[in-house]
Amino acid sequence: MSPIKTLNRARPEAGDVSRRKLVKSLAAVAAAFYIPVPARAAIVRPKLTVVLIAEQFRSDYLFRNFNAFNAGGFRRLIEESAFFPDCRLLSTTFTSTGLATIATGCYPSLHGIVANRWYESAGNRLKAAEPFDLAVTTLFQQEPEPANRFFAVAATESKAGLLKPGAVSGQFFRKPDNTFATLGAAVGKEPEWLTVFNQAHLAGKFRDQPWLPRGAPPGSFPLRSLKYDAAKPENFQALLASSPFAQSAQMQLVREVVHAENLGLNSFDTVVAVLDSIGKLGSETGAVSPLIDDEVLSLDADLATLLEWLDARGQPYQIVFTAAHGAPVEPPTTYRVSPDEIVEPVERALSAEFAKGKTGFHFVEAYVYPFLYLRHDHLTPSDLPRARQIAGNAALATRHVSTFITSDGYSPQFSEWNTRARNSLYRGRSGDVLLAYRPGFVEFVGADRGVSYGSLWNYDAQVPLLFKGPSFVAGRFDHIVEMTDIAPTLAAVAGMPAPAAATGRVLSEAFGEGVS
């Protein structure tokens, strides 16, 4: 008789019984936490792609509000999507930067959009990011078939244009009266359906409107009121633009564009919405606020309506949700940094080294957070590398700055932070020194409230990423992915090459293929 068979038939010792019980117990625990590997999805390009990009939206918004979500909005999207809660923008984290990174699949060091604005030495002026400042092509410029259409809904022409520079139509942007205009259409020549839509969303309908908590009965105490003062209409316009009413108008316009333009029926069409309201609100309140949470719940309701409506059309679609960046919490007053607190010590340090007793010399040309620009006409080319280091170290000696990197790559710190900083440098735009404030510190914006975006820290860099559609498996993937991965992944679904300068990877695990 085989010894193995004999051992298998032998009466177990007491210790063996204990070990077997332990193994069974461990197996039961493992089973409770076991998540099966999803079956591979067939990669199929549906005829309609909807991409929702919140200008500002942290991953923790989904977790802290999850129990308040209705079944058909974010809760459904999370359950039916390939969900990446830790998608990171590993560079400066401004809205224009995030949009450009999503569209191109690369970072500012290649696409050139280092911030919402930067200093332009040649014109001695602040330069706002514009579509033609993109140094590389975007995913949405790569569509080889002219019959396949692209539409964008955004707050401004420039934000819509960063997705597909050069588009002469199909881009909708908000006007101060809360109505939308379309690029390429003369005044009064907008599509008839847009005129009808705008009549239902005129700003005047929201004057003195109370912003009630989601689900609160009429007459409840409002979170705020959209007060209208004829002497200062811009204040009302700002309140409206950051409200759930404006956000809902954008989400409704997405449906209207799909319906009116018959998208996804006879061609492969894409509509992208850049949702700016929560970004505007976040810059006022920071990431933790009852207003932010209520706006998230409002977006949840709008998302549920959109998904239900898309289902009812009976046509296959895919939907992507992400954000251009996250947000810091509102800091104490002592964590707000004015430009003078940076420029003055830097100027003193540079003067001590290079003025050589002369007076009236200024070595700082401009400081546009987080970029410091030096006066090259007051420094020799051989002096510049040393001047940059002196400037960075002078800023580092203040209580506000955590570290820095110069345009020629010097940094006192070697870590993953350096990768984020290097990704943010683009010659001629990012200045001589990039400064990183300490975590929680923000740019002073003219009042003892509000926050600034743009830092390299995770609270600004980390956003959710969700893909729902026939090509994607449902599941949660907790490993870090990058914002540069979005364009290559969507290109793979479309059967197109990744954008020309894309450095991200195809998220093959979203197709059920495992991490590549």
Predicted regions and their residues:
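C-terminal segment of N-terminal export signals and the immediately downstream linker at the start
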Residues: 15-17, 36-50
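N-terminal export leaders
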Residues: 19-23
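Active-site regions of oxyanion-processing enzymes, predominantly non-cytosolic
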Residues: 49, 143-154, 160-161, 247-280, ...
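Secreted, luminal/periplasmic, and some membrane-associated catalytic domains
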Residues: 85, 92, 115-136, 141, ...
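Active-site His/acidic residue clusters
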Residues: 161-170, 228-238, 257, 262-299, ...
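Substrate-binding rim/cap in mid-to-C-terminal beta-strand-loop elements of soluble/periplasmic
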Residues: 344-388, 452-494, 508-515
